[in-house]
Structures are given as C-alpha cells and as structure tokens.
C-alpha cells in the first residue's frame, strides 16, 4: 500500500503542477462554472478516452493521460465549487486556489487509502478501460443527482462521486505509467 500512496502523490503532483500553470495563464475563470458545466467537461474527457480506447486512428495528438489529468483537475474544481459556491467573477488567486486544491486532493487521497485498504487494492487488477467505464457511470449518476436538484434518497452525494472519479483517474494514470 505504501507504493500506492507514493504513486498517487506523483500523479497528483503532475496534475497540481498543470493546475498551477493554468491558473497563471487563465486565473480562476473556472470559478464561474456551475456544477453541471464541470460535470460536462469531465464527461467530454471521459468520452474522449473511451473513443481513444476503441478507435485505432487519432486525429488529435493527445493521448489518454492528458484527458485523465483533466478529469482529476476538473473533479477538484467541482469539489471546490461544491464547498465555496459559484461566483460571478473570478475570486481566487493562484495561492488561494492551490490551498483549496491541496485540501481536496488530501481529503480524496484519504478516502482512497481507506477504500484501498478495504478492497485490497483490487484496482490493480482492473483494466484502464474498466476504470474509464466506471468514471462514465459515475458521471451519469452525477447528472441524475443534478437533475434531482442534488437530492438523493439512499445514495452518496455528488461530492463522493467526484472523489471516486478522481481516484479512478489516478489509478488509470498509475496503470499508464505516469
């Protein structure tokens, strides 16, 4: 399990680095996005990964790895939005956004470590394509919860689904040798 923790941190470090660079380029323009918009961005990334896995021909020179990074970063943005709400104008500088990024990546890693202990690292035996399908399934669940105005009867809330998608994407990146 110690390797998993280190591998997880390496993936998050790569994603975090890109997040910080994009914050420098664009600021926190993403803070205006409502949750369904972030969900749709993650859906686009996951759908592209599935197409890449199924099709031999690629017309855009970007592979699965960059899309999984996008899923991780958009999931953290969604968790930040859930906690802080949507704003009319960007309101976070790079330092503030990075603090929130680190907070949510830490919470999500703790969840992964707890589940990983209980499931005995079963994800290591899974295919990347199965992890992609699980992300797509979680997205459909989130869309349904969003359509239900955030209400669930017996199911986990939206935050748990974003965390699971993020963890599945990290596992996929580890499988891909990130």
Model features per residue range: what roles?
Residues 1-178:
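Intrinsically disordered, low-complexity regulatory regions
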């Amino acid at each position: 399990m110690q390797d998993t923790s280190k591998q997880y941190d390496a993936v998050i470090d790569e994603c975090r680095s890109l997040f910080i660079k994009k914050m420098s380029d664009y600021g926190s323009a993403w803070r205006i996005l409502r949750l369904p918009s972030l969900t749709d961005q993650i859906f686009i990334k996951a759908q592209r990964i599935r197409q890449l896995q199924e099709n031999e021909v690629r017309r855009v020179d970007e592979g699965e790895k960059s899309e999984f990074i996008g899923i991780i970063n958009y999931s953290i943005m969604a968790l930040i939005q859930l906690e802080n709400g949507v704003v009319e104008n960007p309101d976070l500088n790079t330092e503030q956004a990075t603090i929130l990024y680190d907070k949510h990546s830490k919470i999500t890693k703790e969840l992964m470590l707890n589940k990983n202990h209980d499931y005995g690292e079963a994800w290591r035996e899974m295919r990347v394509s199965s992890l992609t399908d699980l992300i797509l399934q979680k997205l459909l669940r989130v869309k349904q919860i969003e359509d239900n105005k955030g209400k669930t009867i017996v199911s986990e809330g939206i935050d748990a689904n974003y965390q699971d998608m993020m963890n599945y994407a990290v596992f996929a990146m580890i499988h891909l040798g990130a």
